[in-house]
From Swiss-Prot:
Gene3D superfamilies: Isopropylmalate Dehydrogenase. This is 4-hydroxythreonine-4-phosphate dehydrogenase. Belongs to the PdxA family. It is found in: Cytoplasm. Pfam families: PdxA (PF04166). Binds 1 divalent metal cation per subunit. Can use ions such as Zn(2+), Mg(2+) or Co(2+). Pathway: Cofactor biosynthesis; pyridoxine 5'-phosphate biosynthesis; pyridoxine 5'-phosphate from D-erythrose 4-phosphate: step 4/5. Its main location: cytoplasm. It comes from Thioalkalivibrio sulfidiphilus (strain HL-EbGR7). Its EC number is 1.1.1.262. Substrate binds at residues 136-137, 274, 283, 292. The lineage of its organism: Bacteria, Pseudomonadati, Pseudomonadota, Gammaproteobacteria, Chromatiales.
Length: 331
């Protein structure tokens, strides 16, 4: 490890706004060394379209990491498979996108990189290329040999983790099992300690049903699943509050001393977070043997190369990755 964090950055879909965001954040001095895994020609061309200065330096893992000056990027070259037109997807570049991710994961696992920041990928075009791909999280978990990862989104001091992720609403109740819920809470508690430097995390847990089940009259998941799991983990030292009604949990009185919230399903917790932190929310994958943060938006093909893409979420993802790397690696 180095005293200056070395952060791997994958821009994602080359026809989307990922390269725009990388060029934009390069205009701001960074406390870490950014190592962008991309095609240098792509970054130079996107900088030209945006009218921004860009100096590219080749990555040398033998050289100690040093903070990047404004207008400069360190690049670990990965050639495109086909020319890129902003806003126009091409299946030929699907393998390029995955190659950058493969290389970034390998670098995080072998210690060359201290954290990973991922730009938005286009799942559809990767699958259209004949490569099964469900998303960053699953890809990173498989490549790093991790068990079921946990999705956490953050906007400022508000952190919301999910007990279930991308499921139809009718499938959510059956997906909340004692073993699954315990796993999520243990991962959340442990990563808040190691990656966020919170010595005794205080976690608020939502109920599944309206009014947290109203004593069993509006559903029994709180009584039969959620409550017993919380009780068992409390006896092991976890500081868990709940199950609480979600409609009152997200109020200043409850949030004031909370380090994280566990929502039972995607649209229970994320609308509040995105309302509070629109444009600066960050997606974080917990439970991996590496630090990964990401933007909380898509490829925005229609904005690529236009200069109209907002870099707020990317900059926050980078800032948080650096902060987490310092906590986890003692940098």
């Amino acid at each position: 490890m180095t005293t200056t964090p070395r952060i791997a950055i994958t821009p994602g879909e080359p026809a989307g706004i990922g390269p725009d965001l990388v060029v934009a954040v390069a205009q701001v001095p960074c406390a870490a060394q950014r190592v962008v895994l991309s095609d240098p020609a792509l970054l130079r061309e996107r900088a030209r379209l945006l009218g921004l200065p860009l100096e590219i330096r080749p990555f040398d893992p033998q050289t100690p990491a040093a903070p990047d000056p404004a207008g400069c990027l360190t690049v670990m070259a990965h050639a495109l498979n086909a020319p890129v037109r902003p806003g126009h997807l091409d299946t030929a570049n699907a393998r390029h996108v995955l190659a950058t991710l493969e290389s970034a994961v390998a670098g995080c696992l072998d210690g060359r990189f201290d954290a990973l920041v991922t730009g938005p990928v286009h799942k559809g075009i990767i699958n259209d290329a004949g490569i099964p791909f469900t998303g960053h999280t699953e890809f990173l978990a498989e490549r790093s040999g991790a068990p079921t990862p946990v999705m956490l989104l953050a906007a400022g001091a508000l952190r919301v983790a999910l007990a279930t992720t991308h499921l139809p609403l009718r499938a959510v109740a059956d997906a909340i099992t004692p073993a699954g819920l315990e796993h999520v809470l243990r991962v959340l508690n442990q990563d808040l300690k190691t990656k966020f430097a919170i010595s005794e995390p205080r976690i608020l847990v939502c109920g599944l049903n309206p009014h947290a089940g109203e004593g069993g009259h509006l559903g029994r998941e709180e009584i039969e699943v959620i409550g017993p799991v919380l009780e068992r983990l409390r006896t092991q030292g976890l500081h868990l509050i709940g199950p609480l009604p979600a409609d009152t949990l997200f109020t200043p009185r409850h949030l004031e001393h909370a380090d994280a919230i566990l929502a039972m399903y995607h649209d229970q917790g994320l609308p509040v977070l995105k309302h509070a932190g629109f444009g600066r929310a960050v997606n974080i994958t917990l439970g991996l043997p590496l630090i990964r943060t990401s933007v909380d938006h898509g490829t925005a093909l229609e904005l690529a190369g236009s200069g109209r893409a907002e870099a707020g979420s990317f900059m926050e993802a980078e800032r948080l990755a650096i902060e987490m790397a310092r906590s986890a690696h003692g940098l």
